[in-house]
From Swiss-Prot:
This is Pyrroloquinoline-quinone synthase. The lineage of its organism: Bacteria, Pseudomonadati, Pseudomonadota, Gammaproteobacteria, Lysobacterales. It holds the Pfam family TENA_THI-4. Its EC number is 1.3.3.11. GO terms for biological process: pyrroloquinoline quinone biosynthetic process; sulfur compound metabolic process. It is an enzyme of class 1 (oxidoreductase). It comes from Xanthomonas campestris pv. campestris (strain ATCC 33913 / DSM 3586 / NCPPB 528 / LMG 568 / P 25). Belongs to the PqqC family.
Length: 250
């Protein structure tokens, strides 16, 4: 029979889920970080990842709208500001667009979403649906993938700067900001989950929420790997580096 865990035991279980299932374990990330992708494959990653970046503040706004405690809302709304910024040139979304600009992707193509892989779109929409439909505790728990973000960000920045001459430190500014934002956000979310997951059922739900979020991130990389690495089957309406690079230059 499952026993009620102490808060620290619950944290250990959550960290074990991340150690096993977080997308730093995905083969696509190994290729990205070790310089094994070509420019077109890196472009495809950045373009598809923008859909996830674009929806982060939508996700956080959905969670915020369900918080009845003003003190809790004041803390959570910082996440929206981090990504939306205080002006069109500020925030995480703007910094990601700076990356796609630096990679030579037409901004209209990126922002329109018309060249996304179906798997990307479905995974992101599944995440938005989850935070809107599940309990507030589960929605907050689903954000706990940020516990594991600093490690993968460090690998990504170092690897991309070492291996890709078309990437600059300025282009990767998004990740430098996340090195401070993600730990702040995950510390708060972890404390909230440890405090409020006070029954066996709730503890099972928060672990399932983190498991689900890991699957969302993993599914996005699965879609990229199938389309742009092996077997190389690209959805006909999705980004094709050769075709869309020519379109960008026209």
């Amino acid at each position: 029979m499952t026993a009620l865990l102490s808060p620290d035991q619950l944290e250990a279980d959550l960290r074990a889920i991340g150690a096993r299932l977080y997308h730093d374990q995905h083969p696509f990330h190994a290729l990205l970080h070790h310089g094994k992708l070509n420019r077109g494959q890196v472009q495809a990653w950045a373009l598809n990842r923008f859909e996830y970046q674009r929806c982060i503040p939508l996700k956080d706004a959905a969670i915020l709208a369900r918080m009845e405690d003003p003190a809790l809302r004041r803390i959570w709304r910082q996440r929206i500001l981090d990504h939306d910024g205080n002006s069109p040139s500020d925030g995480g979304i703007a910094r990601w667009l700076h990356l796609t600009d630096a990679l030579g992707l037409p901004r209209e193509l990126v922002e329109s979403g018309r060249a996304l892989l179906p798997g990307t779109r479905f995974a992101v929409q599944a995440y938005l649906h989850f935070v809107r439909e599940k309990s507030l505790l589960e929605a907050i728990a689903s954000s706990l993938t940020e516990l594991f973000a600093p490690n993968i960000i460090g690998q990504r920045v170092a690897g991309m700067l070492q291996h890709y001459d078309f990437v600059s430190p300025e282009a990767l500014a998004y990740f430098e900001h996340r090195l401070t934002e993600a730990p702040r956000d995950s510390d708060f979310a972890l404390d909230y989950v440890k405090q409020h997951a006070d029954t066996i059922e709730k503890q099972q739900l928060v672990k399932a929420a983190l498991h689900f979020k890991c699957s969302v991130l993993w599914a996005q990389l699965d879609a990229l790997h199938v389309a742009y690495v092996s077997p190389g089957v690209v959805w006909p309406d999705a980004f094709v580096p050769e075709r869309d690079s020519k379109r960008a230059a026209a």
